[in-house]
Amino acid sequence: MADRFMLGFVAAVLVAASVVAGASSIRVPREQPRADDYRVKAAFLYNFAKFIEWPAQAFATPSAPLTLCVLGVDPFGAVLDDTLRGQLVAGRTISVRRLAQVEPGCHLLFIGGSERSRLALLTGQLRRVSVLTVSEEPGFNESGGMIELFTDRDGVQFNISPKAVERSGLRASARLIALAANQRHPSGGRR
């Protein structure tokens, strides 16, 4: 059942990435991150937001946008803005901000590789704040992060820490949790 949901989730990500790229298919190289990798990862961020429920008090008003922040050096560039332009999550527009330090108002925080040495500190500061934390740094979940993106022989994948998500007051869809590599392959997620 989880494999069927994963197939649907990956298909949704690839369709979103294809529309943004103007291509009928996306080849995700495994060697080094490239623009296509980040196009797919941007689509993952969008889909993560669709499968997370934030408490009402996380937003200033009922119509406030969902704010996706990138902390540190931004590996996405314009790809993130292009992917999210015009998209909605639970009826909310999506706003993108780039930050040098954590600031209030973020709902989803992508922590870039330039922040590697501060991961444990950052996740500790955000431990009980309703901010979905995502990074592609190895060991992010073990440092207290919620979703860790990685690329393996099967393409872009993710691990999730349901306890970290719950502790922050967010609710992750059971479907999202079931799609995570570490939930489908409990021996560690990465293959």
PLM segments and residue spans:
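Short hydrophobic alpha-helices and adjacent helix-cap/hinge residues
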Residues: 2-191
